[in-house]
Amino acid sequence: QYGKDYPAILPAAAYKVTRQTGAGRGVYSFCMCPGGWVVNASSEEGHLAVNGMSYQARDSRNANSAMIVTVTPDDFPGTDVLAGVEFQRKLEKAAYGLCDGKVPVQLFGDFCRNVPSTMLGEVEPCIKGQYELSNVRTIFPQELSSALEEGIKGCEALIHGFSRADAVLSGVESRTSSPVRIIRNTEFESELSGLYPCGEGAGYAGGITSAAMDGLKIAEAIAKKYVPCYD
């Protein structure tokens, strides 16, 4: 992003990219980590989910971000209220099974050809936890993997080298937003008085900033109810 002339005085570069596929799906970067790490963030036995993080110095070899493909209820069968959760768990189970719990890694060029990676290129993964070269594409339904490929290739027009053949894909980041939303009333309470659904897990945010803003609203609602002098 900044070039190579002044590395001593410039911070690690951040980016944000978004594209729309020919089929109408959105593909966009999420939780971009300059000079960051991919971490194994699994929370359920037999399932695997990854996330991204940066230390304060932001000085690892790589930048990383989740590349998100939008989904709709048409992508998962059934009308149960938790059908989206089951779809998420299905992806995480497939990711776990691919490399027996290690983070599956694939070069983007191999992803496009739908073949397992057998060696790395110039880009070396920065991953906390064990990883293994594999075929990340097999985790996803065809519609999602095709959209991801098209979206990443489209981002080349925004950042030169974004879709280079040896760019590293890791999977799967499936916790970007909640697949369910806990209903709350005009006072921000759930059906159970005094219980305030809030933030990403409750379905009211999609990132750190929006979760913080939702938290402020909830704090104000609680103060207004329980501290009469708040107004």
Q: Model-flagged regions — what are they?
A:
Residues 1-231:
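Residues forming the flavin
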